[in-house]
């Protein structure tokens, strides 16, 4: 999973440099966590979005491990699987304002499309196979 996280961050650094005020990892850790979670969820179908108990940060759950843009989360007990209300809250709180739309798309939709162009099926297969 760390390989995918690093790939997403490096690709975002290249593709989003003119749209973000700083590097993408900082953005995904401080304000863009929902977008990051949606990107990973768009790549790994069996993953689920999680939110911490304080409703201040979200990440992704895959094979009983929780990840964010920094990698594996050190305090997974502080997170829960997001329900429909949590998702609406996260989209409202952590979602991207229109000024950060990229070519008419949310950052997550834009990045998922870019990732698909990169043909990383083997990486995804390896991640899904390793975690099982």
Model region roles, listed by residue range:
Residues 1-132:
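A structural boundary/capping signal
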